[in-house]
């Protein structure tokens, strides 16, 4: 679960390497985000010449969490790191590539472009 002040790795080539969560979107007083939820972040570490710069405030969707998520069939899926993909207002990714696997739960959130760019969907 991702909450305020959580640092996440960025799993795309938008130029950001690490972001810090400012707010979890979706309802008043919502405290935590899981896979497929949208968060507002600030860029803490970025590569030179990237689309996003250090200090930019961006929206991102969570694609991997250490705490994992329970599926309808009773199975759990967990990852080794917390990671997100920076998105535009139309839910499309800012970058052109996605690194690492993403969870199948992103299909339900209408993030089909991210799912299609990902090398592996678990």
UniProtKB/Swiss-Prot annotation:
GO terms for molecular function: large ribosomal subunit rRNA binding; structural constituent of ribosome. GO terms for biological process: translation. This is Large ribosomal subunit protein uL14. GO terms for cellular component: cytosolic large ribosomal subunit. Part of the 50S ribosomal subunit. Forms a cluster with proteins L3 and L19. In the 70S ribosome, L14 and L19 interact and together make contacts with the 16S rRNA in bridges B5 and B8. It comes from the Bacteria. Keywords: Ribonucleoprotein, Ribosomal protein, RNA-binding, rRNA-binding. It comes from Staphylococcus epidermidis (strain ATCC 35984 / DSM 28319 / BCRC 17069 / CCUG 31568 / BM 3577 / RP62A). Belongs to the universal ribosomal protein uL14 family. SMART domains: Ribosomal_L14 (SM01374).
């Amino acid at each position: 679960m991702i909450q305020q002040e959580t640092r996440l790795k960025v799993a795309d080539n938008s130029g950001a390497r690490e972001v810090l969560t400012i707010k979890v979107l979706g309802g008043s007083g919502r405290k935590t985000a899981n896979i497929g939820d949208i968060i507002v972040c600030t860029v803490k570490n970025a590569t030179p010449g990237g689309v996003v710069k250090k200090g930019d405030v961006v929206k991102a969707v969570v694609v991997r969490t250490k705490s994992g998520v329970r599926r309808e069939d009773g199975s759990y899926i967990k990852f080794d790191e917390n990671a997100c993909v920076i998105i535009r207002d139309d839910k499309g990714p800012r970058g052109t590539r996605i690194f690492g696997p993403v969870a199948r739960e992103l299909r339900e959130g209408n993030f089909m472009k991210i799912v299609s760019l990902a090398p592996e969907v678990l």
